[in-house]
Amino acid sequence: EFWCSAEADALARRVAASGGCLGGVLTPPCGSAVVTEQLEVLLRLADRHNCGVDLHIDEADHGAAQGMVQLLKALQRVPVQVPVTCSHASSLSLLPASSLARLAERMAAAQLSVIALPLTNAWLLARADDATPLQRPQAPIRQLQRSGVPVAVAGDNVADPWFPGGDSDPLALLAASIPLTQLL
């Protein structure tokens, strides 16, 4: 509801003036009409004020790619000229390979970018108090890149509950991310 308010418009003007992005979070379940409407309002607002969009999307170990599918549908109805970045995108890895390839092609056609957050997602996803996770979803970096989707690796947490080991050290982030995501 916030994105429909006068406050949101004022915020978008301030963000645009500072060169920033508008953002939000889409986690499963996200197929409701309310989510669709709010996402479309956010996209229109960002485009009207020339602000990029950064969505934390599909940071989940279930509901494969529900947020991304919703975003792509919204972008068909509300095409934008501003960059749209999708942070996390972990649950995309739960898709069968052929479905992931088709989705990645659609993402590339929509000119989406992805920021993978492997350390945060390894810490949070598939967490259980009484068991070590046997599978942890990660953004499918190589598959997305192969389809033409730009992907960056980053960290979005510094010594907080979402990743207590975060310390703003990009070399440590890269050193841990390479084996975790098998980038080499």
Set out the residue ranges of the language-model regions.
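Histidine/acidic residue-rich metal-binding segments in metalloenzymes
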Residues: 3-85, 91-113, 130-153
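Short secondary-structure boundary/hinge segments and terminal tails
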Residues: 33, 63-64, 124-125, 162-163
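His/Asp/Glu-enriched, well-ordered alpha-helical/loop segment
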Residues: 73-84, 120, 124, 135-184
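Short, basic, glycine/proline-bearing loop/turn elements
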Residues: 87-90, 118-128
